[in-house]
Regions:
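Active-site-adjacent betaalpha module
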Residues: 1-122
C-alpha cells in the first residue's frame, strides 16, 4: 500500500509476500522465530473473516505453540469485510456473504482465542 510505504517508519518494515489468504508456509513463522524480541503484533486488514482472521490466528497459535508471551492486537477500526446480499449472490452464482454478521462473529472468535480485539489504537 503506497500510504503505508509513505510513513516515516517504512524503512523498518519487513514485507513477506503471500499468494493466498493463508499466512502459513510463507516464511512468517521462521521470521518470528528469528525475532524473539517482537512482543506485540498489530493486525490490520480488509477482510475480517478471511486474510485478517488467518493472520491473527496464525500469530496467536504460533505464540501459543512456542510458549511466547507475544501479544496479538487487532484494532476493530482497522478491519472490515465485504457484503454480498442473498439476492445478489443468487444472481451472480456466488455464496451470500453477510458482511456485518461475519465481521462481528470473526472478531468474537479471534477474541475468544486470545487475540486482543480493541476498538482502536491510541
Amino acid at each position: 500500500m503506497p500510504e503505508l510505504l509513505a510513513l516515516p517508519i517504512a524503512s523498518e518494515y519487513t514485507i513477506i509476500p503471500k499468494n493466498s489468504i493463508s499466512s502459513a508456509g510463507i516464511g512468517l513463522g521462521e521470521w518470528m522465530g528469528a525475532h524473539p524480541e517482537v512482543e506485540t503484533c498489530i493486525v490490520v486488514g480488509d477482510c475480517t473473516d478471511l486474510c485478517t482472521y488467518q493472520l491473527a490466528m496464525h500469530l496467536r497459535l504460533y505464540a501459543n505453540e512456542h510458549q511466547l508471551q507475544r501479544r496479538v492486537v487487532l484494532p476493530e477500526n482497522c478491519v472490515q469485510t465485504f457484503d454480498i446480499p442473498v439476492d445478489v449472490a443468487a444472481q451472480i452464482g456466488a455464496f451470500a456473504h453477510p458482511g456485518d454478521l461475519y465481521h462481528y462473529v470473526f472478531l468474537y472468535h479471534m477474541a475468544h482465542n486470545g487475540v486482543e480485539v480493541v476498538k482502536e489504537l491510541c
